[in-house]
Structure formats: C-alpha cells, structure tokens
C-alpha cells in the first residue's frame, strides 16, 4: 500500500491511497463468501454456488460494494498511520479505480487537527487573590449554620413578614383564563426566596392567616413558557398558615449538634475558620489555574475546524443529558419546560465548546513544546490515590479505567497547567 498526503487550504487535505491488487482480490474473495450465503440458486445448496458461475450470472461488479466495505477502513487506517496525520472528522471518499486484478486507487478528503501557534505562555501575569478569613466571615458562616438549624413555628397571630413561610392556595389567570401549571394548594412559600415570579412574594407581606388577595404580576420576557412570557397575570391567593423561623441559641450545645468533632462554641468557630481558610485557598488556586490557562489559550493562534467544535458540542450534550437523568429528567422534558430544542441548546453551548477545544489544543501544544512526560510510577501513584479516595481495590480501579493511557494524558495536562502556574507572576 502507498499513501500520499497533500495539504490544501486551512485544515483540509487529500490522502491519495493505492492498494495492491492482491489485497483487492482478497477483499473480493471475502465479499463473495459473504454474499453467496444469501443467494438461492436452483441446483445448488445455499452458499455452495461456484464463484465462476456467480460472476457469469451476476457479474463481479456485484461484489464491489461489499469488497470496498471490507478493504477501505483498513487501507484508510494504515494510510493515516503512514502519513502521521490526525483526522478530526469523517473523510470524503472518492474511488478513482477499483477492478478485479487491479490496484485500488482512492482519495480521502480529510479535515485534520489544526496547527497551534503558541503565543506568550510563560511569565503570564495573574491576579493575586486575598485568602484572608475575617471574623465577619466566621460570623456569617455561623449565622448560616444557625439558619439551617432553624425550626418553622406557626404564628398564631401577626402577619406575613419577609423571611416567613406562608402556606397558600393560589390560582393564576391571564386575560381572565386559568392557565396550565398556575394552580397550587397548601403550597409552602418562603417569602423573600425568589421562588415565584418577581413581585409575587412581596405582595403577600402584611396578610393574616385566612385572608385572600389578588396578586397582580407580569411574567418576565424570558419566561420558559413562551405563551406566558411578558404577559400580565392575576393570582388569586389565600393564606392558610404563617410560619416563622425560630433560631436555635448559639451555645456549646448548638456547636455539638452541628459538628460532632467539637465540644464548645469556640471550637466550632475555630473549625469554621480553618474550613474557610482551606476553602478560600482552594478557590484561589483554581482561579489562578483557570486564569493562566485562559490567557495562554487567548494568546495562541489557531484556526479551529468546525468539525472539532461539533464533536465537542455532541460530547457536552451527552454530559448534560447524563446530569438531567440524575435528576429524573430527560432532554425531551427539558425542551418542553424551557421552550427550546436541540439546535437552540447547541447554540447556547457553542461558545463554551469553542473555548474547550481551544484550551485543549493549546495545552496539548504546550505539552509538546515543553516535552512534558508522565512516568509509569506517576500513573500508578494516581491509581492508588483513586483507590483510596473511592475505597476500592487498586485492581478494580485499573479494570474500570481499562487503559491507563487516558489517565496518563490527564496527568500530562495537569502538569502543563502546573507549568503555567509555576512560571506565572503576580499582576
């Protein structure tokens, strides 16, 4: 087999591939063995018709498509290996010559991975992030814990206030007509939570249990149900019950209730401070890593093929579909609820897909430029770390991974980002 690669404009080129006649005849033999099993000919058992008689009756050309299906994938794959190109989309195949006892000649128009011209990626200026934890930060975290431990207690007297939970019946009308999904009974609505459309919750403030009110609102222009978007509506609301938050007292007992590792309120505050410090440090590290990667990607010159963006979009949609399934939803339901469709979803994701592809290509180029390698020991150490994290045997992790090659590539990327961070400077 012989293969020649000719680069055309942009990221497109043509592979010209010639396959020896011997391989062509082998593919025709294999095609005949496959096809003859499906033919009923009087005087012969199924699959036993002689080849010469078959060709005389049906013509050798009747085997060509099956033979091509056999020979093309192998020849194309070998041509890719021989020329060292990296296709990113299915090729456009054009058969120039295919006959029995003759060499096969075909071309494949191929879109390949683009060349990356790296810009500045060493010495990138990154913003220094303050990771100081103040007393106010600790107090706010303590208050949040206190809020989460609060109990809802029925208010026998009084009116709805911000922060209360009102148990209500409601029914919505647009132009005097009730609409689907606009009715609820004994619904617990936290006032000030922003659960309902803007303006709804505020109009319940001041009502007593047993009172009713017509709440006038306008659906937002971007509301997911297109038939309601931007339209004024009236909700008939009845308040059945009002519940107020009763906060627990901040003392040693509270501290022990929320964290079994501490015995006093002071110990809880110290633990909160440590956790906040670790969280801020972790967040700062992530921001720095994201910043250097984004700057290195922005500084590079790349002509990204649309095929790579489409492939990434398909991957992102699959990831999104998996997340939906974990919430008991599927894409069709999501499209109904949001008034969107597959094309609109992809359009929303396209910018992120372009960003992902650009970053991946740039990191790959940096790995090559800096000769970043990963030793087998590093891969094994990472597998052991994963086994400890998931509380699984090392062999089970290896089996789940299948090949360690993908993990090694992930570690190279991590090293490339480490390199960018280590070689950055404070802005």
UniProtKB/Swiss-Prot annotation:
UniProt keyword terms in alphabetical order: Cell cycle, Cell division, Chaperone, Cytoplasm, Isomerase, Rotamase
Enzyme Commission number, as recorded: 5.2.1.8
Gene3D superfamilies cross-referenced by the UniProt entry: 3.10.50.40, Trigger factor ribosome-binding domain, Trigger factor, C-terminal domain
GO annotation, cellular component aspect: cytoplasm
One GO-annotated biological process of the protein: chaperone-mediated protein folding
Keyword Cell division tagged: yes
Keyword Chaperone in record: yes
Superkingdom: Bacteria
GO MF annotation terms: peptidyl-prolyl cis-trans isomerase activity; protein folding chaperone; ribosome binding
Signal peptide limits: none
The PPIase FKBP-type domain, residue ranges: 163-248
UniProt note: domains: Consists of 3 domains; the N-terminus binds the ribosome, the middle domain has PPIase activity, while the C-terminus has intrinsic chaperone activity on its own.
Family: Belongs to the FKBP-type PPIase family. Tig subfamily.
Protein name: Trigger factor
Organism, scientific name: Bacillus cytotoxicus (strain DSM 22905 / CIP 110041 / 391-98 / NVH 391-98)
The encoding gene: tig
């Amino acid at each position: 087999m012989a293969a020649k690669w000719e680069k055309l404009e942009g990221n497109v080129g043509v592979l010209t591939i010639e396959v020896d006649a011997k391989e062509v005849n082998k593919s025709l033999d294999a095609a005949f063995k496959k096809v003859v099993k499906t033919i009923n000919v009087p005087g012969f058992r199924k699959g036993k018709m002689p080849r010469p008689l078959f060709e005389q009756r049906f013509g050798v050309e009747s085997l060509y498509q099956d033979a091509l299906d056999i020979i093309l994938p192998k020849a194309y794959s070998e041509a890719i290996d021989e020329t060292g190109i990296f296709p990113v989309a299915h090729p456009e195949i054009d058969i120039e010559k295919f006959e029995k006892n003759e060499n096969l000649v075909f071309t494949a128009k191929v879109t390949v991975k683009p060349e990356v011209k790296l810009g500045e990626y060493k010495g990138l200026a990154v913003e220094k992030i303050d990771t100081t934890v103040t007393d106010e930060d600790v107090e706010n975290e303590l208050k949040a814990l206190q809020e989460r431990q609060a109990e809802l207690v029925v208010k026998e007297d009084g009116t709805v206030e911000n922060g209360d939970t009102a148990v209500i019946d409601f029914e919505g009308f647009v132009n005097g007509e009730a609409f689907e999904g606009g009715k609820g009974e004994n619904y617990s609505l936290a006032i000030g939570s922003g659960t309902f459309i803007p303006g709804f919750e505020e109009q319940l403030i001041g009502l007593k249990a047993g009172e009713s009110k017509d709440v006038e609102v306008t659906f937002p222009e971007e509301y997911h149900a297109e038939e309601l978007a931007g339209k004024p509506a009236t909700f008939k609301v009845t308040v059945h019950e009002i519940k107020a938050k009763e906060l627990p007292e901040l003392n040693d007992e509270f501290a022990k209730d929320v964290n079994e590792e501490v015995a006093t309120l002071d110990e809880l505050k110290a633990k909160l401070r440590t956790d906040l410090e670790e969280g801020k440090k972790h967040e700062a590290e992530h921001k720095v890593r994201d910043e250097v990667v984004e700057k290195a990607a922005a500084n590079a010159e790349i002509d990204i093929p649309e095929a790579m963006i489409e492939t990434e979009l398909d991957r992102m949609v699959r990831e999104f579909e998996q997340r939906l399934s974990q919430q008991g939803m599927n894409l069709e339901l999501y499209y109904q609820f949001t008034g969107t469709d597959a094309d609109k979803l992809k359009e929303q994701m396209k910018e992120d897909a372009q960003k992902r592809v650009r970053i991946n290509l740039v990191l790959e180029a940096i790995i090559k430029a800096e000769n970043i390698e990963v030793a087998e020991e590093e891969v094994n150490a990472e597998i052991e770390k994963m086994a400890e994290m998931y509380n699984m045997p090392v062999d089970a992790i290896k089996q789940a991974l299948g090949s360690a090659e993908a993990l090694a590539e992930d570690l190279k990327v991590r090293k490339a980002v480490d390199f960018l961070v280590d070689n950055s400077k404070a802005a």
